[in-house]
Regions:
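Structural and coupling elements of P-loop NTPases
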Residues: 1-346
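A short, hydrophobic C-terminal helix/tail in secreted or cell-surface proteins
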Residues: 347-351
Length: 351
């Protein structure tokens, strides 16, 4: 997603970019933020619009200050999260050490879902801890089932025990079964994990090598399987006409409202205001009211952004992320809504 000349030169992100990904029946709006601590403001903007987060940790460097800052942002915005340990294809990378560092910081909330298989120091596959099965890569992300090697059994049992404890804590019935020595089915484990990830009591750890596309499909499966439906997350502000709380909650049927979480000014792209639609369906040529600037804005064209590529769309639905071109008075942090609503998310934050 890095397209800026300076990003290409540095070989790292310096600003947030939107990368929509369609995976199965789901659309995932990925806000790819810089990992360097120098650009933490970009991550703050993205976190304010996100419904969940994936914290990327270098398998070589391990947990760093940026990792902890990203975790703190997730805590601030109450975001469900998972951790993706990258660079597993590199020599001398220890997934186990990264998991130990994370566990030392965040305790029993850390729960690995996968662990790597290595032969002669090379990353050749992984063990799915939920399914208790091994997979060997045969070509990039293509894989086949394989036996679990003896050298992996000790840590597999340790990581699996952590998962089973989390499953047991979701209900009295499961707790009784756990202490009775009963096994949980894969479906029961997955359902319990989704509940625990949603409320933040469990933070899954995945791993792979995006350069080789290894582990990417697993990550997308885990995002769709374990992160909560955004419509279940509260999204509210103040209706200034009534001075009452307006629960937007990403409802298509409610009056239109959206927040501006980032402004892009590019010599080639021009000025774009990136928006998260909180309720209703926003269409090009809508006239919306900016409560913060006390002015109306007539929308022109709407876009979804794929990195540096703007794609024009006729409308954006509640819960989606997109961009509006050439707003005049609107700034980052402002709220747009219909006149009948006069919705502001800022006012709600001050309650």
């Amino acid at each position: 997603s890095d397209f800026d000349k300076e990003e290409i030169k540095r070989k790292c992100s310096i600003s947030t970019t939107l990368v929509p990904v369609v995976w199965g029946k789901n659309k995932i709006n990925v806000l790819d933020t810089p990992g360097m601590f120098d650009f933490v403001g970009e991550a703050q903007e993205a976190a304010s619009a996100a419904d969940a987060a994936v914290i990327v940790v270098s398998g070589k460097a391990g947990v760093q200050v940026g990792t902890q800052k990203a975790w703190e942002l997730c805590e601030k915005y109450n975001l469900p999260r998972m951790i993706f340990v990258t660079e597993m294809d590199q020599d001398d990378v220890s997934y186990r050490e990264v998991v130990e560092q994370l566990t030392e910081l965040y305790g029993k909330r850390i729960a690995p879902l996968h662990m790597p298989l290595r032969e002669n120091g090379k990353f050749v596959g992984y063990i799915n801890i939920v399914k208790n099965k091994g997979r060997r890569y045969i070509e990039k992300d293509k894989k086949e089932e394989c036996p679990i090697p003896d050298y992996s059994v000790e840590y597999l049992e340790k990581y699996r025990e952590t998962l089973m404890e989390s499953v047991a804590e979701t209900s009295e019935e499961f707790m009784d079964r756990y202490f009775g020595g009963e096994e949980f089915s894969v479906a029961e484990i997955s359902a319990a994990l989704a509940m625990n990830v949603g409320d933040g009591t469990i933070v899954p750890v995945c791993m792979g090598s995006p350069v080789n596309l290894q582990g990417v499909s697993n990550l997308l499966d885990d995002i769709c399987g374990y992160f909560p439906d955004p419509s279940t997350r509260p999204c509210a502000g103040i209706n200034l006409n009534t001075n009452e709380i307006f629960e937007a909650n990403y409802d298509f049927a409610k009056p239109k409202s959206a927040t501006i979480f980032k402004t892009i000014v590019d010599p080639f792209l021009g000025k774009y205001s990136m928006i998260k639609v909180c309720s209703g369906v926003i269409k090009s040529d809508d006239v919306l009211y900016n409560v913060d600037q006390e002015s109306e804005e007539k929308l022109s064209k709407l876009y979804v952004l794929e990195g540096s590529k703007p794609i024009e769309v006729p409308e954006l639905h509640a819960g989606d992320i997109g961009a509006i071109a050439k707003l005049t008075a609107t700034r980052t942090g402002d709220t747009l809504s219909t006149n009948c609503l006069l919705y502001t998310s800022r006012a709600h934050e001050t309650l």
